[in-house]
């Protein structure tokens, strides 16, 4: 009798799925925040949480085990020197998935996955500066009138 396994297939073969999650994990460690589909973000969260938990041990054995998943020396260096130092006292919950609006082209559910302690909020009272889009677009009526 077939039993359901608790992981998403992401519409890929096993090798392609493993490579995709490895690449997403590497980029999350290097950039601290990535935007992807909701399903990939949730699966990446599972992988990264386990990787960071292993990295907290700080042993050479842990580095070798993690290197099987990540395969990027720069990411391993950042993980063990920077991330573990900052997240060292936290007991799990190292990542956060924030849902976004659907993607324009195919309406896929999008999300941002980020490391929790690296989330940087803009300074209070400071609003983001909006660009005047009419100056940016070629041939717009506003830019012709202003000229």
Curated annotation (Swiss-Prot):
Residues 124-134 have a biased composition (Basic and acidic residues). The keyword Mitochondrion does not apply. HAMAP family: Ribosomal_bL17 (MF_01368). Part of the 50S ribosomal subunit. Contacts protein L32. The keyword Ribonucleoprotein applies. Belongs to the bacterial ribosomal protein bL17 family. Keywords: Ribonucleoprotein, Ribosomal protein. InterPro entries: Ribosomal_bL17, Ribosomal_bL17_CS, Ribosomal_bL17_sf. It holds the Pfam family Ribosomal_L17. This is Large ribosomal subunit protein bL17.
